[in-house]
Amino acid sequence: MKKERTESLVAQALKNIGNDRYKLDNLVFARVKQLNAGAKTLVNMDPKRHKLVDIAIREIAEGKIDIDRIDERN
C-alpha cells in the first residue's frame, strides 16, 4: 500500500460523498464505532498499528464505505 498524505485521502473521501464535510464526519464516526466493535477492515491496514479514524477515512476514500453501506451494518 502506498503512503498518501492525510489531506489527499480526506479530499478524495469528501469527493466520494459529494463534498459534504458534515456527512463525512458522521460517516467516519459511524465506521469507527463499527471498527471499535470488531468489524473487519475493508482495506489492508492493521487496526493495532493504525488509528481507526485513518482506516475509516481510507475506506471512504477508496469507495469501500458509503452512507448506504454504513446504514446496512447498523
UniProtKB/Swiss-Prot annotation:
A Pfam family recorded for this sequence: RNA_pol_Rpb6
Organism placement in taxonomy: Bacteria, Pseudomonadati, Campylobacterota, Epsilonproteobacteria, Campylobacterales
GO CC terms, sorted: DNA-directed RNA polymerase complex
Reaction equation(s) it catalyzes: RNA(n) + a ribonucleoside 5'-triphosphate = RNA(n+1) + diphosphate
Top-rank taxon, per record: Bacteria
GO MF entry, a single one: DNA-directed RNA polymerase activity
The keyword Disulfide bond is annotated on this UniProt entry: no
Cited function: Promotes RNA polymerase assembly. Latches the N- and C-terminal regions of the beta' subunit thereby facilitating its interaction with the beta and alpha subunits.
Protein name as it appears in the record: DNA-directed RNA polymerase subunit omega
E.C. number: 2.7.7.6
Coiled-coil intervals, chain numbering: none
InterPro entries: DNA-dir_RNA_pol_omega (IPR003716), Pol_omega/Rpo6/RPB6 (IPR006110), RPB6/omega-like_sf (IPR036161)
Summary of subunit composition and partner proteins: The RNAP catalytic core consists of 2 alpha, 1 beta, 1 beta' and 1 omega subunit. When a sigma factor is associated with the core the holoenzyme is formed, which can initiate transcription.
Enzyme class: transferase
Keywords, sorted A to Z: DNA-directed RNA polymerase, Nucleotidyltransferase, Transcription, Transferase
Family: Belongs to the RNA polymerase subunit omega family.
GO BP term (any one): DNA-templated transcription
